[in-house]
C-alpha cells in the first residue's frame, strides 16, 4: 500500500515538473516614460495568459535613484512580442514606514484625493499630502487643499498620460504644490503618496498608445 502511494506521488511530481517545463519565462519591460527598463520575469505556457498581469518594483530600481526607495510602482502587462512583455503604469504607493516617519506632532496634514482625466483621456486617482511646518488653522488648511486640487486638475488637463505619471513620480507635481502652498502657509513636505489608473482612453486611442510603446521600447533595448 505504501509502495503504491509512493509511486502515485512520484507520478504527481513528474506531472508538476512537466507543466513547469512547458512554461516560457517572459521578460517584462516598462513603457518608454521609464526608459523601457527591465522589470522582471513572469512564467506562462501561453502569451495570452501574460496579458493583464501586474508586476511590482520600486521606483529606486526603475530610476537608479536611492532616494526613491519608499515608492512602489505597479505595471500592468498590455502587450507581448515574442518573449517580451510590455507593461503600462498601473499605479504606485508609498511605504507605511516612510509615511509614519514624515508625520510629526504640531504639524498639520492636509490630504487631497482626486479622480482626474489626462489630456489623452486616461483616468487616474491621485492622492497627495501636504505637511505644514507647524500647526495650521482650519481656514489655512482649507485654502491649501483647494490649491492642491487646483494644481492637480490643471496638470492632468495639460499633460498626456506618460507626462502626468512622470510629474507625479519624479517631483514636478510635489514641487509645484509646495511652491504655491507656501504662499499660504509654511510647508515642510509634499508627498504624492498614491495613485491608481481607473480607466484607459477609448479603444482606438489606446491601441495607438500600445503600438507606439512597443516601437519605442524596442528602440530603447537596441
Curated annotation (Swiss-Prot):
GO terms of molecular function: structural constituent of ribosome
SMART domains, sorted: Ribosomal_S3Ae (SM01397)
Keywords: Ribonucleoprotein, Ribosomal protein
A biological process term (GO) from this entry: translation
One GO CC term, this protein: cytosol
InterPro entries in the cross-refs: Ribosomal_eS1, Ribosomal_eS1_arc, Ribosomal_eS1_CS
Similarity field: Belongs to the eukaryotic ribosomal protein eS1 family.
UniProt name for this protein: Small ribosomal subunit protein eS1
Source species: Methanocaldococcus jannaschii (strain ATCC 43067 / DSM 2661 / JAL-1 / JCM 10045 / NBRC 100440) (Methanococcus jannaschii)
